[in-house]
């Protein structure tokens, strides 16, 4: 796991009420927020993200970055002193790209690594015209290209290890982006405020996040109002994941996905699990608990359309599950949707997908974005 501290680095500042949504909602949200940026403060306040701390002092803005995972409390925290805006960054994950994309700041990205399942039209354009360069793949970065792109910072993922030490030796500060480790959906999205701080676009970041937060909390309230008379026992049940190697890989009971299930008005079968990330459990144990669940959430990359028949081929026992028999398996295909890029900054759309499945009467006109029932 990466553990390093950035004490001080100054940039060169070189120029370079919910009804229905579609995938284009991202840009409508962005435009709506940016039209009202004057209503928002330039000061960043962190409300949900456990891995970010911002402190305004006379010498600049002190940002402390840590791993939100409670089990990672021993890791070294990263300290950044922001004294002026930066506009040249390298991203090494799709989620990092999405943080810039939702703010309309893709032009600040001068380098990317893997281009697999890249959805951003703007990033494809920048890669084609040379505004953004490919820096190689994890474990085999092209260090000459990295240095030539003159980045102010390189965002890295603490879950990946290959080649990052070599990047560090280039003398360019690395920043761990722990957004994916946050246990609250709004905590994941709030990492866009870090981008706002580094680029000097704090007002923009505050405005966009406020729109995301408003949509998420408004829908939460609608779900609560619609379901409070039903009682906990009347809520639909949901199981997650499927067999990976020798066990059943589920999302932990304290994960952001478990929080989404709860906010969408469902009971997560594995809610008593204390893990905040994914966990591999005994297949038979999860199967016994999940066989009668009303819904089943799974995801993965699949070329073409993934079907119930394809799922049953993985393990014939899947076909005996109630969610399978009732065609209530909710699947997100990473090869066909920009989940890895944008889901982390669109928690309101993830929530709406599940609300549409669990309580369709609340969102009768909603168009699904990420999770759709398998046929």
Enumerate the language-model features and the residues they cover.
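Bacterial N-terminal signal peptides
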Residues: 1-7
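Flexible, glycine-rich surface segments
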Residues: 221-308
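A ligand-binding cleft/hinge motif common to bilobed small-molecule-binding domains
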Residues: 159-169, 300-312
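Alpha-helical scaffolding within the catalytic cores
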Residues: 214, 218, 280-285, 312-318
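Stable alpha-helical elements in mature extracytoplasmic
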Residues: 85, 96-99, 105, 142, ...
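Extracytoplasmic substrate-binding proteins
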Residues: 131, 148, 152-247, 271-272, ...
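A short, structured surface patch at a secondary-structure boundary
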Residues: 56-73, 82-147, 153-159
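Bacterial Sec-exported substrate-binding components of ABC uptake systems
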Residues: 11-97, 204-239, 305, 312, ...
């Amino acid at each position: 796991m990466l553990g390093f501290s950035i004490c001080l680095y100054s940039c060169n500042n070189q120029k370079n009420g919910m009804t229905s949504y579609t995938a284009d909602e991202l840009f409508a949200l962005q435009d709506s927020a940016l039209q009202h940026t004057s209503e928002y403060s330039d000061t960043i306040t962190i409300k949900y993200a456990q891995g970010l701390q911002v402190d305004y002092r006379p010498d600049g803005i002190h940002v402390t970055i840590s791993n939100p995972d409670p089990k990672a409390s021993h890791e070294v925290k990263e300290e950044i002193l922001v004294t002026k805006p930066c506009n040249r960054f390298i991203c090494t994950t799709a989620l990092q790209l999405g943080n810039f994309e939702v703010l309309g700041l893709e032009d600040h990205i001068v380098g990317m690594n893997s281009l697999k399942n890249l959805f951003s039209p703007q990033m494809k354009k920048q890669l084609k015209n040379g505004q953004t360069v490919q820096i190689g793949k994890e474990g085999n970065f092209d260090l000459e290209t990295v240095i030539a792109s003159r980045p102010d910072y390189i965002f890295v993922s603490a879950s990946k290890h290959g080649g990052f030490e070599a990047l560090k030796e280039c003398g360019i500060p690395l920043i761990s982006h722990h957004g994916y480790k946050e246990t609250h959906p709004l905590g994941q999205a709030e990492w866009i405020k870090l981008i706002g701080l580094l680029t000097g676009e704090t007002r923009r970041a505050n405005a966009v996040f406020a729109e995301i937060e408003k949509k998420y909390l408004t829908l939460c309230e609608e779900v609560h109002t619609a379901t409070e008379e039903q009682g906990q026992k009347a809520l639909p049940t949901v199981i997650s994941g499927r067999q990976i190697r020798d066990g059943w890989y589920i999302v932990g009971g304290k994960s952001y996905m478990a929080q989404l299930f709860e906010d969408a008005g469902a009971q997560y079968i594995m809610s008593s699990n204390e893990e905040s990330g994914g966990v591999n459990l005994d297949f038979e144990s999860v199967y016994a608990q999940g066989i009668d669940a009303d819904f089943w959430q799974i995801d993965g990359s699949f070329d073409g359309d993934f079907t119930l028949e394809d799922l049953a081929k993985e393990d014939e026992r899947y076909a005996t599950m109630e969610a399978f028999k009732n065609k209530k398996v909710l699947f997100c295909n990473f090869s066909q949707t920009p989940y890895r890029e944008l889901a982390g900054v669109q928690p309101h759309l993830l929530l709406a997908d599940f609300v549409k499945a669990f309580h369709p009467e609340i969102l009768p006109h909603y168009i699904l974005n990420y999770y759709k029932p398998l046929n």
